[in-house]
Amino acid sequence: MRLTKLLQKHSAGYTQIEVKELSFDPGFRAACEQNACGFYGACWMCPPDVGEVAALIARAKSFEHALVFQTVHEIADSFDIEGMHRAAKAHNHLIARLRRAAEKNEIDCWPLGAGACGGCKTCAKKSGEPCRHPGRAVVSLEAAGVDVVELAKRTGLPYINGKNTVTYFGVLLFRGAPE
């Protein structure tokens, strides 16, 4: 299945840009270090365990193209944390499907998501084990130094989508012919 068809099926907004158009700022790692989400040091794909931000930026810049997408989810109100978690889970499920579709089509890719990886019900880090699925684990855009607000502006994908909604962004970095 073509990646854009999968995004259309899930009513996700998307566009494609060149990786050189992405705005990187190592300072975005500071948001992770403040531990507002509670995953700093609690998930292998979150700082500090995910690696140095400079190395993640270098890895991202090694790709040519970026399929940028967003999912918009309705929530009860701006305090609906459970609704936000359900929405994040749905967004991460879409990222996993995109990765599988890309790999099935032999596309060398690296997906970046929103927030903690979420690939496992409980991250192996909590029990002191290594990551169970390092090939499927997802690093967040912010942990990789991506300026998501600038990304939204540059791509024309809205960052705010109305009252009682939450919007999540993802990027599938890839090499080769554009999708």
Which residues are covered by each model-predicted region?
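Catalytic cores of enzyme domains
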Residues: 13-43, 47-179
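TRNA-binding/sensing appendages of the translation machinery
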Residues: 1-17
